[in-house]
């Protein structure tokens, strides 16, 4: 982003691909609606079987900042994915928005981007192809990545509080927290299963639930930065001494 000079930014993961009209349709949507962000939908491409599955939860239209941020936090019709969107570059430069060095960095950052967008347009077309491979973040899930997922959820709370709008989106944030908790339960079980050790799996799940409750609670100190947010989940190797 530091070397970008154009009016708009768009991101594509190196192992994914896009439809031939991907940029054209996003550009037309953002310019014709005088929007700050334009979003499209995507296909899951399961590489090994060469099967395409279109993401099912969709919407279409032009949304105000509040409407779009609320949808983003619910993480269904609009998701915290950096790569199926085009952005007005000034949102980043004028608000000093960068991506932290962590897994799930888009989740930690998307809320800041949307909080500074006056208008968001969504087109109900799947123009991006998200390759599901054995080397992706979720396919290679481990304790460090699960901890970053939880940390990213806390960073969303910190960002909303810092912007003075948390109370406006508290219900949506709680929905995001519940979804994160359920996803992390699944990732914890998957991690233990891949390591062929279920010892400590309940300990890790309890830690996840406790951390998510804390980050969504009234006593959470939102002045923390992400480097100060502690790890929650341990590797199965580190938990072998625990009793399930």
Task: Tell me what each language-model feature is.
Residues 1-2:
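Short, conserved alpha-helix that lines the donor NDP-sugar binding/gating region
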Residues 9:
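Short aromatic/hydrophobic "clamp" motif used to bind/position activated sugar donors
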Residues 35, 191-244:
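Membrane-interface aromatic/basic loop that binds lipid-linked glycans or pyrophosphate carriers
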Residues 174-187:
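Amphipathic alpha-helical repeat scaffolds of TPR domains
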Residues 169-176, 202-203:
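Short, charged, amphipathic alpha-helical segments
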Residues 14-121, 131-141:
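Donor-binding/catalytic cores of nucleotide-activated saccharide
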Residues 127-133, 140-165, 187-191, 195-216:
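Catalytic core of nucleotide-sugar-dependent glycosyltransferases
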């Amino acid at each position: 982003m530091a070397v970008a000079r154009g009016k708009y930014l768009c991101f594509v993961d190196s192992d994914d691909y896009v439809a031939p009209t991907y940029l054209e349709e996003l550009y037309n949507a953002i310019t014709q609606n005088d929007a700050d962000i334009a979003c499209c939908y995507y296909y899951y491409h399961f590489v090994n079987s060469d099967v395409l599955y279109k993401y099912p939860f969709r919407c279409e239209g032009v949304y105000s900042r509040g409407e779009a941020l609320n949808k983003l936090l619910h993480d269904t019709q609009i998701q915290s994915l950096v790569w199926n969107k085009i952005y007005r570059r000034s949102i980043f430069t004028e608000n000093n928005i960068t991506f932290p060095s962590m897994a799930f960095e888009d989740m930690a950052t998307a809320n800041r981007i949307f909080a500074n967008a006056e208008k968001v347009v969504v087109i109900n077309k799947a123009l991006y192809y998200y390759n599901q491979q054995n080397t992706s973040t979720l396919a290679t899930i481990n304790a460090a990545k699960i901890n970053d997922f939880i940390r990213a959820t806390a960073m969303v709370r910190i960002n909303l509080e810092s912007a003075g709008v948390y109370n406006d989106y508290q219900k949506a944030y709680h929905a995001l927290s519940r979804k994160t908790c359920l996803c992390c339960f699944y990732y914890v079980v998957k991690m233990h299963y891949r390591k062929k050790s279920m010892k400590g799996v309940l300990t890790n799940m309890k830690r996840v639930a406790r951390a998510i409750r804390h980050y969504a609670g009234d006593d959470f100190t939102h002045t923390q930065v992400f480097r100060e947010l502690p790890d929650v989940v341990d590797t199965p190797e580190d938990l072998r001494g625990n009793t399930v």
